[in-house]
Amino acid sequence: MGDYDESGKSLSNLTNIAVADDGRFAVLDSVYSRIFVYSSDGNLMYEFGGSGNAEGKLNSPVGICFMDEKVLVVDLAYQSVEVFAPTEYGHLINQGLEAQSRYDYDEAAGYWQQVLDINNNFYYANLGLGKFWSKRNRVRQNVHRLPLQYLSG
């Protein structure tokens, strides 16, 4: 946090954190105007934002908070509150996390499968399905569905 590269430019400055009801948390990087959203156990789920004048970009973000699935960002330069709604992909991830936070692995599995239909390399969705299969005592019957790299530790 707050490190510099060889030229003296700041690599990142993590200035604010918000926590959602389901345990997700968002971290604001004020140098690059990016927001990183993590699961309650610290796995990066997705990121968004960036510097600029276009829609979805920020100039001088100073604060963030959750409002349901939306992330609100206070931008000092624009003197505004920018509202970011999740994409369909982000919505599915949020729903999977929310169901998992209630230990409803049956419901979460449906969301994780939809996430994998969009991005079959999303590690956390594979873990979520693994929790579902484990909960259902079907690991031996379904272990062939998990990619090998996720089975070795």
Each language-model region and where it sits:
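Eukaryotic scaffold repeat domains enriched in small/polar residues
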Residues: 1-133
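Alpha-helical positions within canonical tetratricopeptide repeat
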Residues: 107, 140-142
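Hydrophobic/aromatic packing residues within the alpha-helices of TPR/SEL1-like helical repeat arrays
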Residues: 112, 146-147
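Structural marker of alpha-solenoid helical repeat scaffolds
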Residues: 118, 151-152
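Heptad-repeat amphipathic alpha-helical coiled-coil interaction surface used
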Residues: 129, 149-150
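Short coil/turn linking the two alpha-helices of tandem helical-hairpin repeats
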Residues: 135-137
